């Protein structure tokens, strides 16, 4: 069974993007390469159990096991040593990536309080989009009663497009609700 968004991309979006940006080949059409979810857990320095809970929640959200990220440098002000675990990340590709994007756009983002669309300024200049989520409770897999504390996470959508304009059009066609 192929994913609904992937099917839409192949059948509807590719021809529309070729027409809009006058590509000569279908291989020039931008596509989503990967989605990276990152959760920095600053208080993991003092209490390692916080990191375990964050890893568990990120695993539920993404549907695959997160990688624990470690500190690159020691910072005395934060009581941080090089190599200490301070966060978790997940890289989604293929089917899981499309599943997550579908869930993010159609279920999770509409659950954000006072939601007026995501910022259109969060592109990096090379066609990648970054979105900060303030609380993990917007995802349907997270059970409100089992959450010990509210944590945010970063969602980075990496595309093959060369410009922000192309990436924005791609994400808009996928249904990303940009603020007007």
From Swiss-Prot:
InterPro entries: Ribosomal_uL5, Ribosomal_uL5_bac-type, Ribosomal_uL5_C, Ribosomal_uL5_CS, Ribosomal_uL5_dom_sf, Ribosomal_uL5_N. GO terms for cellular component: ribonucleoprotein complex; ribosome. The keyword Ribonucleoprotein applies. GO terms for biological process: translation. Keywords: Ribonucleoprotein, Ribosomal protein, RNA-binding, rRNA-binding, tRNA-binding. GO terms for molecular function: rRNA binding; structural constituent of ribosome; tRNA binding. The keyword Ribosomal protein applies. PROSITE patterns: RIBOSOMAL_L5 (PS00358). PANTHER family: 60S RIBOSOMAL PROTEIN L11-RELATED. Part of the 50S ribosomal subunit; part of the 5S rRNA/L5/L18/L25 subcomplex. Contacts the 5S rRNA and the P site tRNA. Forms a bridge to the 30S subunit in the 70S ribosome. Belongs to the universal ribosomal protein uL5 family. NCBIfam families: PRK00010.1. This is one of the proteins that bind and probably mediate the attachment of the 5S RNA into the large ribosomal subunit, where it forms part of the central protuberance. In the 70S ribosome it contacts protein S13 of the 30S subunit (bridge B1b), connecting the 2 subunits; this bridge is implicated in subunit movement. Contacts the P site tRNA; the 5S rRNA and some of its associated proteins might help stabilize positioning of ribosome-bound tRNAs. This is Large ribosomal subunit protein uL5.
């Amino acid at each position: 069974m192929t994913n609904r968004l992937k099917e839409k991309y192949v059948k509807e979006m590719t021809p529309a993007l070729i027409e809009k940006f006058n590509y000569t080949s279908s291989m020039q059409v931008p596509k989503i390469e990967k989605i990276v979810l990152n959760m920095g857990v600053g208080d993991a320095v003092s209490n390692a159990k916080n990191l375990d809970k964050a890893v568990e929640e990120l695993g539920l959200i993404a549907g695959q096991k997160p990688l624990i990220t470690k500190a690159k440098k020691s910072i005395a002000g934060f009581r941080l040593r090089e190599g200490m675990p301070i966060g978790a990340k997940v890289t989604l590709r293929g089917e899981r990536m499309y599943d997550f994007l579908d869930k993010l756009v159609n279920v999770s983002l509409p659950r954000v309080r006072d939601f007026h669309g995501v910022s259109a300024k969060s592109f990096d200049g090379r066609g990648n989009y970054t979105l900060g989520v303030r609380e993990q409770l917007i995802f349907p897999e997270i059970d409100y009663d089992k959450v010990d504390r509210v944590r945010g996470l970063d969602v980075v959508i990496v595309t093959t497009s060369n410009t922000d304009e192309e990436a924005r059009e791609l994400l808009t066609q996928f249904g990303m609700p940009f603020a007007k």
